[in-house]
Regions:
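An acidic intrinsically disordered interaction segment
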Residues: 1-8, 95-103, 127-132, 136
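Hydrophobic helix-and-loop "lid/oligomerization" segment in the mid-to-C-terminal part
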Residues: 2-24, 32-62, 82-83, 164-322
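Short amphipathic alpha-helical face segments that pack within enzyme cores
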Residues: 29-39, 131-138
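Anion (oxyanion) recognition and catalysis
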Residues: 42, 66, 141
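Short alpha-helices
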Residues: 111-179
């Protein structure tokens, strides 16, 4: 083992189970990196599990989880916070993308700059890297071990998602990882799992989604008044974010006792995960990545689309002013 991997292993005990925890409301990169690290640590004799906070929101991500066929723990199912030693991947409690740590924090592996100094025994934060899966791939390379096709598929799916198929925030490490993984993974399967899929019966509902919206400057919010699936929220958000002069989109399903939401950003100064997490913290829970986030809101605490969007904008401007 080389320096990074050996240092990580030096802070982990084989006498205590390891919990690999993703950022809240995980995406393909978070789960792909977690799965690949699980397989690597297992090869060294560690007992490892994966956990996440929030919800798994999109249809494509559900398909990805089913493909990996790896049990996932929800953080609220963990009662004994002393049972696990925790490695957080693709997120950090020091950035705010992880609200609750599911055990004793040992390590943070991320590709987003933290908002405060890490106190973990091991920290590997590489803000210049496009995907956390690329960092975990580098651990595999350092180990000299061979990964199987499913592990390769998990990592390349993460890179595809976070770099938008190598079209944003790409580093040489991402390219090196992608090149090798391309020939060792099921690329056709990853393409199917990354592209959000919907059912034909959803088309009419999607059409109705554009009749109730509010725009303030480059921010847009849409409310959907029927019981929409999380997949449809993702499809609508993915479409709206590419409207000219729009940089931040929120889609909220306002039906039932708990409202689902999906958010997208294409401005590097507008961190969707942070903005959603902070805005909904007193009315529900949420979070995710800089470019995409999700959440749930208690219907009785929802302040309405105008107040909600204004809260997002006020927080965004205060962050930009720092």
């Amino acid at each position: 083992m080389e320096e990074k991997l050996s240092t990580l292993c030096s802070v982990l005990s084989k006498d205590q189970p390891v919990l690999i925890q993703t950022h809240d409301f995980p995406d393909h990169d978070a789960l792909g990196a977690a799965y690949a690290l699980l397989k690597l640590l297992e090869s060294y004799g560690y007992k490892v599990e994966i956990a996440y906070g929030g919800h798994i929101q999109s249809l494509s991500l559900i398909e990805f989880v089913e493909y990996l066929d790896c049990p996932l723990l929800k953080l609220d199912e963990i009662d004994d916070l002393k049972k696990y030693q925790v490695v957080i991947v693709d997120g950090s409690p020091f950035k705010g993308t992880v609200k609750k740590v599911g055990g004793i924090l040992k390590a943070v592996i991320d590709h987003h700059p933290a908002r405060m100094q890490s106190t973990a025994a091991y920290t590997d934060i590489r803000a210049e890297i496009g995907a956390c899966s690329s960092i975990i791939w580098s651990y595999w390379k350092e180990s000299g071990k061979e990964y199987d096709e499913m592990t390769a598929t998990a990592m390349i799916a993460g890179i595809q998602l976070d770099t938008a198929f190598l079209s944003r925030s790409v580093n040489k490490l991402d390219l090196d990882a992608y090149y090798e993984l391309y020939f060792k993974s099921d690329v056709q399967k990853t393409y199917q799992m990354i592209k959000t899929t919907i059912n034909i019966c959803d088309l009419e509902e999607i059409g109705r989604a554009f009749t109730d919206y509010l725009r303030i400057d480059n921010f847009l919010i849409v409310e959907l008044s029927e019981d929409y699936s999380r997949a449809i929220l993702s499809v609508v958000a993915d479409f709206l974010i590419w409207i000219k002069d729009i940089s931040f989109v929120i889609v909220i399903e306002t039906n039932g006792p708990e409202y689902k939401l999906s958010a997208r950003s294409r401005d590097s100064k507008l961190d969707a995960g942070y903005l959603i997490q902070e805005t909904v913290k007193d009315m529900g829970s949420g979070g995710g990545h800089a470019h995409m986030a999700g959440g749930v809101i208690d219907a009785e605490r929802y302040c309405g689309k105008t107040a909600f969007l204004n809260a997002i904008i006020a927080l965004a401007r205060s962050e930009q002013g720092k």
